[in-house]
Amino acid sequence: MSEKRPIEMLEGILKEINKTGQIDESAIASRSGLLICSTLPEKQHVETLVAMSATMFGAAEIAATELGLDLLDRIVIESKNGKLIGTGAGPKALLLVMTGPDINLGLVLVEIQKASEKIKQVLG
């Protein structure tokens, strides 16, 4: 039996987190905004979404540092139709998840934290 390649492991992490019932879609991006893998349909301009999300995360990290705050845990973008939550997954990657508007945010954040730790382990 052959070992899974890192990309297969990352795709498995996304599929697992999407099974929670609270998360609609998810993606992993490099901190510079390059798509690593995603469960989003191609028609949604995934590359643009992850690039803009990484830019927002980086800007929020700079703002937090300038304000003397601790390291940034996450960004949450809310609209009436849903949420986009981004969190660091080690020094190399970001985990981005899309949810509906009426989620149990605490449960989602716990699942995101577990998934980001797994991503960090895969990417080293």
Predicted regions and their residues:
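Acidic, low-complexity cytosolic segments
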Residues: 1-23, 32-124
